[in-house]
Amino acid sequence: MKIRKAEKKDIPRILALLGQVLQIHAEIRPDIFIPGTTKYTPCELAELLEQEDHPIYVAVDEDDLCMGYAFCQLREQPFSTNMVPFKSLFIDDLCVDKQTRGQHIGESLFEYVKQQAKELGCYEVTLNVWAGNTSAEHFYEKMGMKTKERQM
């Protein structure tokens, strides 16, 4: 397995994985998520691949098939009267194909994102988890993440 930046050839597999994530969210929150859809269209995903401040990393197998991804956003907090300026790398979405879970691909992707954040001069890596997504909560806690804010 290797991890690299996503390319246009990865779009079909990324869309399939986005569908897996959306299904989980639709089961947790059927009042707002629509099963059988994805967060992005192929065109939107192609545009996203061009944005330097929205890197998408993919874990690929020996045949260069995408087994998982991490959608990220580089965020900058400018100086204000109450906060020092800093950069963070926000994980907008992380998924490993349900057929390849349990092979430490998610851990590898997460560690890769942390390394990229360090190389980009980021102060921290952040993310959101939907309430009820206990497997994601446990995964991120295992990776050392701690809750620092709750939205209600």
Where are these regions (language model features)?
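A short beta-loop-alpha structural element at the N-terminal edge
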Residues: 2-17
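Conserved GNAT-fold acetyl-CoA-binding loop/helix
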Residues: 23-45
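A short helix-loop-beta-strand connector motif used in the catalytic cores of GNAT acetyltransferases and
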Residues: 43-58
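Conserved beta-strand in the GNAT
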Residues: 58, 65-74, 95
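Glycine-rich acyl-CoA binding loop
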Residues: 59, 102-110, 117
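A short, internal acetyl-CoA/4′-phosphopantetheine-binding micro-motif in the GNAT/acyltransferase core
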Residues: 60, 76, 92-101
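Conserved active-site alpha-helix within GNAT-family acetyltransferase domains
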Residues: 107, 111, 119, 131-149
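Conserved GNAT acetyl-CoA-binding A-motif
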Residues: 118-128
